[in-house]
Amino acid sequence: MLNNAMSVVILAAGKGTRMYSDLPKVLHTLAGKAMVQHVIDAANELGAAHVHLVYGHGGDLLKQALKDDNLNWVLQAEQLGTGHAMQQAAPFFADDEDILMLYGDVPLISVETLQRLRDAKPQGGIGLLTVKLDDPTGYGRITRENGKVTGIVEHKDATDEQRQIQEINTGILIANGADMKRWLAKLTNNNAQGEYYITDIIALAYQEGREIVAVHPQRLSEVEGVNNRLQLSRLERVYQSEQAEKLLLAGVMLRDPARFDLRGTLTHGRDVEIDTNVIIEGNVTLGHRVKIGAGCVIKNSVIGDDCEISPYTVVEDANLAAACTIGPFARLRPGAELLEGAHVGNFVEMKKARLGKGSKAGHLTYLGDAEIGDNVNIGAGTITCNYDGANKFKTIIGDDVFVGSDTQLVAPVTVGKGATIAAGTTVTRNVGENALAISRVPQTQKEGWRRPIKKK
């Protein structure tokens, strides 16, 4: 179906008192992303010509958090109801475009449902998203005559008979811009709340003989709003359950779907296995046959085929070629790169460092601002001393180098191909190819040595 041009209004002016937070409610995160960002992304995916964000409380924080989005900021200085919020945005509506109204605290609304609503909107009428609840207490009821929608009555204004109605308003609707402006101008606050209800435009449209078409979402969770942290946590679990189900159906083995969090996007190959309590953040790519152990955090990284990440490892902004092994308890920081078959063991940290093919850093090591060749052995306790208190410097280690345990490499320094660094050495000058570097104090031995005795 060919749709009219469309703009979106997102209401995000509420204080969120029940969140007990200094942060605007809509900036609280779901799956690692602000609730309102989920809604903005949906609007953009629908092809909105403009996104008008109605804000009030915490405007500076909102603008900072959403600075990368192309938004028209609309101030609602006083929160006098949803109709009043839309009135603030109305001057920006074009007469010949459709206006879709969304909410910054309803984060799981799907693009598919919104597209169905858009397609269902009758010419000159209103598309309305509704659901039926077993317990509709507190929600606006949908009134009908002969099956046709005639209006919405808020719970506090409803009669006892109207309160028996189970079909309720979700607050999401779409209408023509010229019609919307005309109806908004007619709103009054003559109701129990003393507010301007956007829902009153339904009755105004009906009185003009306009058709109102109700559409239902695919899932109830799509239209659930967040007023407190308990509700937010419940929607988080709904979202994570849906993501886990999609991954399982796509062939990813999640050992316990209830203990897996996806806070971004995951691209994966075949036969991927993910153990419990793993968190995926940002954009992550997993190759074929990748195995991730329990408690790992993977963020904005590419993991090659046949890699194995042992439990409680953190990988951030890193790239791993095929057949690498990491962990347990390893940390790859931004700029870490492992070439094919490299190994990083327990309590090893890498930052802006490359570990060559087949090279190993088995345990208790820091590799920062380093370029390490192929088939290098990094002994336990090795440290690249890359920082002098003001500037960072680079360590370069050639192919086939053996670095003994408890070695410090004071950058800038280069170790040539095939060199050996004796255990306990502090390297302060370049080491030539195939050379042995040793800086230990000669060992002495005192026969018959007696330990000091504590005085009583």
From Swiss-Prot:
User: What EC number(s) does this enzyme carry?
Assistant: 2.7.7.23, 2.3.1.157
Keyword set, alphabetical order: Acyltransferase, Cell shape, Cell wall biogenesis/degradation, Cytoplasm, Magnesium, Metal-binding, Multifunctional enzyme, Nucleotidyltransferase, Peptidoglycan synthesis, Repeat, Transferase
So where's the catalytic machinery, residue-wise?
A: 363 (proton acceptor)
Co-factor: note: Binds 1 Mg(2+) ion per subunit.
Listed pathway(s): Nucleotide-sugar biosynthesis; UDP-N-acetyl-alpha-D-glucosamine biosynthesis; N-acetyl-alpha-D-glucosamine 1-phosphate from alpha-D-glucosamine 6-phosphate (route II): step 2/2; Nucleotide-sugar biosynthesis; UDP-N-acetyl-alpha-D-glucosamine biosynthesis; UDP-N-acetyl-alpha-D-glucosamine from N-acetyl-alpha-D-glucosamine 1-phosphate: step 1/1; Bacterial outer membrane biogenesis; LPS lipid A biosynthesis
What's the catalysed reaction? alpha-D-glucosamine 1-phosphate + acetyl-CoA = N-acetyl-alpha-D-glucosamine 1-phosphate + CoA + H(+); N-acetyl-alpha-D-glucosamine 1-phosphate + UTP + H(+) = UDP-N-acetyl-alpha-D-glucosamine + diphosphate
Co-factor requirement: Mg(2+)
Does the entry feature the keyword Cell wall biogenesis/degradation, yes or no? yes
What NCBIfam families does the database record attribute to this sequence? glmU, PRK09451.1
Q: Which HAMAP family match?
A: GlmU (MF_01631)
Q: What is this protein called?
A: Bifunctional protein GlmU
Q: What is the lineage of its organism?
A: Bacteria, Pseudomonadati, Pseudomonadota, Gammaproteobacteria, Enterobacterales
